[in-house]
């Protein structure tokens, strides 16, 4: 009976690990595809758009909102009259765990209207969409045409925005369940003002990465 019980526990544990790793991989890769699509659109301006000054294309904010993660903001036209602002950043739940969200605002300069609301016209109960439920870290780096890191890329400096050639995005995803027998310390070494931080627990973590050529920003 003991042997059968042990075999069941081992099988169940192995199955859970396989399932969790598959969920982590799917979450990390699908979110990177979404972010990459927005990054490729960053800075796109319709030739007939004249509603506001074209001075914002891409921005990074270090250690956003009390987390160690970055905030990425992207702007581009979706029509001759409309522009959207898309933000990616970490939020904390009531347990203090972080998750990655995507927020979309239509015409952020002239008449800002958030998407994903219970009622769009009255902006009732608007909230960003969660794209990764268990995200430990979210980091963004901008590089110039020579591969050098760029700092202070924000809407207060169009000069720095125009220098961005590629963007690197790193997302660290945590397993939904505790899968390790003993706690392991994970150390995150981040740039900017975030610095390094550690997590010590029984969860698995995996970091997913993508580098994107900003085809529209390069043309500006």
Regions found by a protein language model. Name each.
Residues 124-220:
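Short linear sequence signals and composition-biased patches located at protein termini or domain-edge surfaces
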Residues 4-132, 144, 159, 170, ...:
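Extracytoplasmic beta-strand-rich oligomerization domains located immediately C-terminal to a leader/signal peptide
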């Amino acid at each position: 009976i003991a042997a059968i019980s042990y075999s069941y526990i081992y099988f169940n544990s192995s199955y859970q690990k396989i399932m969790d790793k598959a969920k982590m991989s799917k979450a990390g890769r699908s979110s990177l595809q979404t972010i990459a699509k927005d990054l490729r659109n960053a800075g796109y301006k319709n030739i007939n758009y004249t509603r506001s000054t074209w001075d914002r294309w891409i921005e990074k904010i270090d250690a956003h909102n009390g987390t160690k993660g970055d905030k990425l903001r992207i702007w581009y036209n979706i029509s001759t009259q409309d522009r959207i602002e898309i933000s990616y950043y970490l939020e904390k739940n009531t347990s203090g765990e972080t998750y990655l969200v995507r927020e979309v605002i239509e015409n952020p300069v002239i008449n800002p209207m958030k998407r994903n609301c219970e009622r769009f016209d009255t902006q009732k109960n608007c909230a960003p969409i969660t794209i990764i439920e268990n995200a430990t870290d979210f980091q963004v780096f901008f590089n110039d045409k020579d591969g050098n890191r760029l700092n202070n890329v924000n809407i207060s400096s169009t000069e720095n925005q125009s220098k961005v050639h590629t963007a690197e995005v790193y997302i660290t995803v945590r397993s939904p369940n505790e899968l390790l027998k003993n706690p392991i310390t994970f150390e995150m070494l981040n740039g900017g003002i975030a610095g390094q931080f550690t997590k010590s627990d029984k969860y698995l973590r995996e970091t997913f990465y993508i580098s994107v050529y900003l085809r529209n920003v390069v043309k500006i």
